[in-house]
From Swiss-Prot:
It comes from Staphylococcus saprophyticus subsp. saprophyticus (strain ATCC 15305 / DSM 20229 / NCIMB 8711 / NCTC 7292 / S-41). This is SsrA-binding protein. GO terms for molecular function: RNA binding. It is found in: Cytoplasm. Transmembrane segments: none annotated. One of its GO terms (cellular component) is cytosol.
Length: 154
């Protein structure tokens, strides 16, 4: 059974937590067009395979898919366009330094509403090796079995 989303959460990148070790998180605003926010509020955003990148002192979110708004007209948005992220200059510089190190990248973890504004939770992540992923799955299965046994006993 899939996990329930917390209130306000519009999209979540659960695969990122499986593929990466998240070392640090930061909240960023996102620049959207009118039809994009309408589509996001309907729940048709997908963070899978998306990443953030520093370009000329600005940060952009690439490869995030937002389905076209159904009631939109011919001026609807491009589903996979690069979207600018709103961060302070020093935060962008700090994240840019971290991603210059080998093996680090910035991945979006969650898309949510906060006081009516759309926010993205970004994670500074280091990729897991294949054996790390297998080990994490084994540990998760053991914890699930222990929880099941404890529930059956009490």
């Amino acid at each position: 059974m899939p996990k329930k989303k917390s209130p306000g959460t519009l999209a979540e990148n659960r695969k990122a937590r499986h593929d990466y070790n998240i070392e640090d998180t930061i909240e960023a605003g996102i620049v959207l067009q009118g039809t994009e926010i309408k589509s996001i509020r309907r729940g048709s955003a997908n963070l899978k395979d998306s990443y953030a990148q520093v370009n000329r002192g600005e940060m952009f979110l690439n490869n995030m898919h937002i389905a076209p708004y159904e009631e939109g007209n011919r001026f609807n948005h491009d589903p996979r366009r690069s979207r600018k992220l709103l961060l302070h200059k020093r935060e962008i510089a700090k994240l840019g330094e971290r991603t210059r190190e080998v093996g680090y990248s910035i991945v979006p973890l969650k898309l949510y509403l906060k006081h009516g504004h759309c926010k993205v939770l970004l994670g500074v992540a280091r990729g897991k090796k294949k054996y790390d992923k297998r080990q994490a799955l084994k540990e998760k299965a053991v914890q699930r079995d222990v929880a099941r046994e404890m529930k059956a006993r009490y």
